[in-house]
Amino acid sequence: MNTQQLAKLRSIVPEMRRVRHIHFVGIGGAGMGGIAEVLANEGYQISGSDLAPNPVTQQLTSLGATIFFNHRPENVRDASVVVVSSAISADNPEIVAAHEARIPVIRRAEMLAELMRFRHGIAIAGTHGKTTTTAMVSSIYAEAGLDPTFVNGGLVKAAGVHARLGHSRYLIAEADESDASFLHLQPMVAIVTNIEADHMDTYHGDFENLKQTFINFLHNLPFYGRAVMCVDDPVIRELLPRVGRQTTTYGFSEDADVRVEDYQQIGPQGHFTLLRQGMPDLHVTLNAPGRHNALNAAAAVAVATEEGIDDDAILRALESFQGTGRRFDFLGEFPLEPVNGKAGTAMLVDDYGHHPTEVDATIKAARAGWPDKNLVMLFQPHRYTRTRDLYDDFANVLTQVDALLMLDVYPAGEAPTPGADSRSLCRTIRNRGKIDPILVSDPAQVATMLAPVLTGNDLILVQGAGNVGKIARYLSEIKLKPQIQEEEQHG
């Protein structure tokens, strides 16, 4: 939306003239930065604050946004509205100052809902797969020439950004259930990929509460809207009779409306057939590994088919799909020093998955595409509460790799929980007798501690949602070779 379109919107909604300056607290987060980017391109004055620069803040600065790397009351001066991340506490000085100045303070999802209000909204929700599915839907719509606006929680690699302003009526957005704020959204189409117990503090530890919240989200659809849901997921199958909207199901299940058949993986690509009711079968080559990504593609195809998008555009988009940042993100293949007299290489893959189901899917994709590789994982648990609540699941999943290095828990603001730390998890895994995990207390020592477990035919998965992605990039920069200065500093 350019300046002319912004003027048109303000003529439709005269009250929008009151909003000129939008301030974001926690602007460096992917979800926050994406919305800020769309609004900057719509012509609004954007400012924001965060603790440190990152690629998101750099992109926003290039668009003319003012970024403060501190949290001070004066940062919100002259703001028309303050948008706050769910990670920001109520006693943040900018939030306090905004309330004192009677500046409206809203959550990220409320602003996303305003962006969606006058567009054809497509919202992608679920415990796992949201970011990739959002990127797939966006890629198909772009390939079909529909020029969508999209707001994603991860980097869309084909576009090089988390969000992009299109000039059509379509807005494709990731919907976040972590704080239940997706209830603000009122889309025309909603995808639900799966529902598992996660972020249970938001739902007071009550899984029934979580399930009902997803139902409430789907009931934000108009009666003529459509819910696209993965029938392979047992919770979704259970909830389907309670969804009072038109539904399309997808999955490997025989009763799915859009059914995945004959899946096989060759290296990083999946090959499968999609069977659609009353439509020609689609023989898909998907440039993303794993059965879980075939499901994500089936969801995207279900939405695109309902919209009437040409099959050729769908197939082109999936075959050329470039993925999203930190979702089985291939960082390179690096030569290693000779091992047992033979030179070899190691592939390096960075992945955001931090729930046992996600980690399991990543491991399965790696095994399917590269069955002969020595599978090495560098894992960083994310949050003590998640590690505590899913402790046995983590222990079971992590024993599937050939070698495991584990960093300390990334706390994300939480206090340590006894028995839910990395040392305890390593001990539990070791006692099961399959692998002997290595605890890495000093991240600077990762390359040094990684070297002895490599065989010369390796696939290294760097796994987690904390700051482990920075370690993955560092390993790529040094080509997996331990640095002398590190050894001197920490030896």
UniProtKB/Swiss-Prot annotation:
Q: Which GO terms describe its molecular function?
A: ATP binding; UDP-N-acetylmuramate-L-alanine ligase activity
Report whether ATP-binding shows up as a keyword of the record.
yes
Binding residues for ATP: G126, T127, H128, G129, K130, T131, T132
GO cellular component labels? cytoplasm
Question: What is an annotated GO biological process for this record, any one?
Answer: cell wall organization
Q: Which PANTHER family match?
A: UDP-N-ACETYLMURAMATE--L-ALANINE LIGASE (PTHR43445:SF3), UDP-N-ACETYLMURAMATE--L-ALANINE LIGASE-RELATED (PTHR43445)
Family membership, please give it. Answer: Belongs to the MurCDEF family.
Name assigned to this protein: UDP-N-acetylmuramate--L-alanine ligase
Q: Which organism is it from?
A: Salmonella gallinarum (strain 287/91 / NCTC 13346)
